Design a protein with these regions (language model features):
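Short coil/turn connectors between adjacent alpha-helices in alpha-solenoid helical repeat scaffolds
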Residues: 2-15, 46-57, 86-97, 124-136, ...
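Structural signature of alpha-solenoid helical repeat junctions
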Residues: 32-36, 73-77, 114, 132, ...
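Structural register within alpha-helical repeat arrays
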Residues: 44, 85, 122, 160-162, ...
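Amphipathic alpha-helical segments of tetratricopeptide repeats
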Residues: 19-29, 62-70, 99, 103-110, ...
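C-terminal non-catalytic interaction modules
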Residues: 1, 267-270, 274-279, 283-286, ...
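Solenoidal tandem-repeat scaffolds enriched in leucines and small polar residues
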Residues: 114-117, 121-178, 192-199, 203
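Residue register of alpha-helical TPR repeats
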Residues: 36-39, 76-80, 117-119, 124, ...
Length: 370
């Protein structure tokens, strides 16, 4: 019954039920059946996450007694509940915790489907942090090629995540076309996979811009995605807004492009603030800074200091290095040699490429929400 309510998007009903359980206002006999209790708490938290109420979900978890732990995984629902807690760490910017939790959960997993979910979350958080992109790529590639499972969601996301890392590294030899063709085949084989189209479109646009060097096609692709998403509140819509802002910032020095870029960055930033997504928020703020520098406007130095501190604290390593890059531009300082060597080692190809360009060209650094 609870699952049916979730599938039918009756999130507020599940939240109301969850609130009653948390306040102890539900039938006390419920607690005699631990699995029944877990279902109520699980769908309560799932509903909060669907509505972007990540911090509320965090508060519920932090304020309630932890009535079971990793030693107690003896059914699918207990696994799913623990996996949700690991994903909550990811969604609330505790990436290192999510990595540790997903690795521990992997050891307790009893089915292939459970194992691949843990592996995907592990690689996904590695990609966010950006300190071991090659390991993340290896995990995504293995998941993309594996024939031992049938989870299309994991496969599609693994394929485009692997491609996204190679695009970030500016690998021109990677077979991006094959990746997008494979995803298209998976989507065409099952109508239920249509929901993943906007997510794929985002990466296809980055491919068109960075690898094919065709900003006009990238803009067209992103605009098509917006037409699909305009009436929704899905997070991916704001990722698309961010990518459009990037295209308008970089490819033409026109006043109307400044205004369009600023508007899309601002939409993405405000959404990210609402759901406490500091990855998207800080990238949007850094994009606005590069935009203003390009057009000769002032930037918020105090905000830049905050981004440097917060991205360092949250282990958002790529964002942190973007902020340091901008700090050097503002101070009119050369990029320190040790920093350039670090970017080369980490394969932060855009930072390495644009750090050697003229000052006016430095503003065209392509930012990536990993």
């Amino acid at each position: 019954i609870l699952h049916d309510q979730y599938v039918n998007n009756n999130f507020y009903l599940l939240i109301d039920l969850g609130e009653l359980e948390v306040k102890g206002q539900i039938n006390s006999n419920l607690y005699e059946d631990k699995e029944c209790w877990i279902y109520i708490r699980y769908y309560y938290l799932k509903a909060l996450l669907e509505l972007g109420l990540y911090n509320k979900a965090r508060e519920v978890v932090d304020n309630c007694d932890n009535q079971f732990n990793l030693l107690n995984i003896n059914s699918n629902i207990t696994f799913e509940y623990q996996y949700l807690l690991a994903d909550l760490d990811h969604l609330t910017n505790y990436f290192q915790n999510a990595i540790s939790f997903s690795q521990a959960l992997l050891k307790k997993s009893s089915t292939i489907d459970q194992k691949i979910k843990c592996q995907y979350l592990y690689a996904h958080c590695l990609r966010h942090i950006g300190e071991d992109l090659n390991l993340a790529f290896t995990v995504f590639s293995d998941l993309a090629k594996s024939t031992s499972y049938k989870n299309d969601k994991i496969r599609i996301r693994s394929i485009y995540s692997a491609a996204s890392i190679k695009m970030f590294q500016r690998d021109k030899n990677y077979n991006y076309k094959n990746s997008f063709e494979t995803i298209n085949e998976i989507i065409c084989n099952d109508d239920k996979n249509e929901i993943w189209k906007p997510y794929v479109i985002r990466h296809k646009a980055i491919y068109e811009y960075k690898i094919c060097k065709d900003p006009y096609m990238a803009e067209k692709t992103l605009r098509e995605a917006i037409n699909l998403l305009e009436v929704t509140s899905l997070r991916i819509k704001y990722d698309i807004y961010f990518e459009l802002a990037e295209v308008y910032r970089i490819y033409d020095n026109k006043l109307n492009n400044y205004e369009k870029s600023l508007a899309f960055y601002s939409e993405a930033e405000q959404f990210a603030k609402r759901v406490h997504d500091y990855n998207l928020q800080s990238n949007s703020q850094l994009g606005i800074m590069l935009l203003n520098l390009k057009y000769g406007y002032e930037i918020n130095i105090e905000m830049l200091r905050t981004i440097i501190i917060e991205t360092h604290n949250l282990n958002l390593n790529i964002n942190y290095n973007y902020a340091i890059y901008i700090k050097c531009i503002i101070a009119n300082e050369a990029i320190p040699r040790e920093l350039s060597l670090y970017w080369k080692k980490m394969q932060y190809s855009d930072l390495l490429l644009y750090s050697s360009k003229s000052k006016s060209e430095k503003y065209n650094l392509k930012l990536t929400v990993m």
